[in-house]
Regions:
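Bacterial N-terminal signal peptides
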Residues: 16-27
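Short, structured beta-strand segments at or near domain termini in extracellular proteins/domains
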Residues: 308-322
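A short glycine-rich, aromatic-capped structural motif
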Residues: 85-151, 173-176, 248
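Ser/Thr-rich, Proline-interspersed low-complexity disordered segments
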Residues: 29-82
């Protein structure tokens, strides 16, 4: 079990135990929303260790309100501007130029999320959902992308090549192959700051949907389903800009090298992280992670060669018009 799993479990036996639990409880586990509850589905190396940004448990809990129901505390947003990417068919969301709060207040997150600071970004576009098996297969068919390291998922022996899962997020793709796909599609990986703004909006929400803890309609997390779900399955969990699946489902690669906000040469205007390093960053948490670990400010430092069954990505590109 790799280091991100250690953040969740603390033991190398966690994966095997989860598989046993899931196998015994398949009939009783929570299911993803039905097709009528879903928004439309949009179609646009060597395994190494992965470590969380902090191995120790957080010293305090974030200021999160307990949900009285599973409904979001704000209306589901309707994106003001969208477009379809010509190369991969992804629906993309316009994120306007402006400031947002990045990171966490002391006592509300983990140490590498401090200090919370104001960042200004130029306008950009970002995929509404994670890149799917269907989309990634088109890049492989063009001879540009490598196939995922494995064709399975956490509980499914056949996943990547199974027509049943075409519109589920591609997994077992390392940072290099994620970037290769985005370039093939005429895009790039989002910066860490771009990803966080798209996830939490300008007000610094704890989660994409607001400041209440997730419920079963917000996200795929904490083994409620036990594996990936179809992209776009949780419209109640949309961010203020309409981005979906930015909490749970699969972690997502971003462009930056990992660095502490307090020690790295971190700009407050269009930051891009350190100039070099040993680890890249993944964001968003996954279907395995607890509510605390799918917060929009949570950071994971990951070897760029790493690939796993709960790690995917989405793409972005800079806007010409601001």
């Amino acid at each position: 079990v790799a280091g991100v799993r250690a953040k969740v479990s603390g033991t190398s036996a966690f994966r095997g135990l989860l598989l046993v639990i899931i196998t015994l409880a398949l009939c009783g586990c929570a299911e993803a929303p039905t097709a009528t509850e879903r928004v439309a589905t949009f179609s646009p190396f060597v395994e190494d260790e992965v470590r969380s940004s902090s191995q120790a448990a957080p010293t305090s809990n974030p200021t999160i309100l307990s949900p009285a129901t599973h409904q979001p505390d704000t209306p589901i947003p309707t994106p003001a501007r969208t477009q379809m990417a010509l190369d991969d068919g992804a629906i993309m969301l316009f994120i306007p130029k402006g400031d947002f709060l990045m990171g966490s207040l002391k006592g509300e997150g983990e140490k590498d999320e401090y200090p919370q600071h104001t960042v200004q970004l130029n306008a950009f576009w970002i995929d509404q959902t994670e890149v799917t098996n269907r989309m990634y297969r088109a890049c492989v068919a063009d001879g540009v992308c490598n196939e995922p390291r494995r064709s399975s998922s956490f509980t499914r022996e056949e996943y990547y090549g199974n027509p049943q899962y075409l519109d589920y997020p591609v997994v077992y793709v390392n940072w290099f192959d994620a970037g290769r796909y985005c370039r093939w599609a005429g895009k790039r990986l989002p910066s860490e700051a771009e990803w966080e703004k798209a996830a939490r909006g300008s007000e610094g929400f704890i989660y994409p949907w607001g400041n209440i803890e997730p419920g079963t309609l917000h996200a795929n997390y904490d083994l409620l389903v036990g594996d990936t779900t179809e992209t776009g399955s949780y419209p109640a969990g949309a961010s203020p800009y309409g981005a979906l699946d930015m909490a749970g489902n699969v972690m997502e690669w971003v462009l930056d090298w990992y660095g502490e906000y307090t020690t790295s040469p971190y700009k407050t205007y269009d930051p891009s992280g350190p100039e070099n390093g040993a680890h890249r960053i993944a964001r968003g948490g996954s279907y395995l992670f607890s509510p605390f670990l799918i917060r929009s400010a949570e950071r994971y430092w990951v070897s760029p060669y790493y690939a796993d069954d709960d790690l995917g990505f989405r793409c972005a590109f800079s806007a010409v018009d601001q």
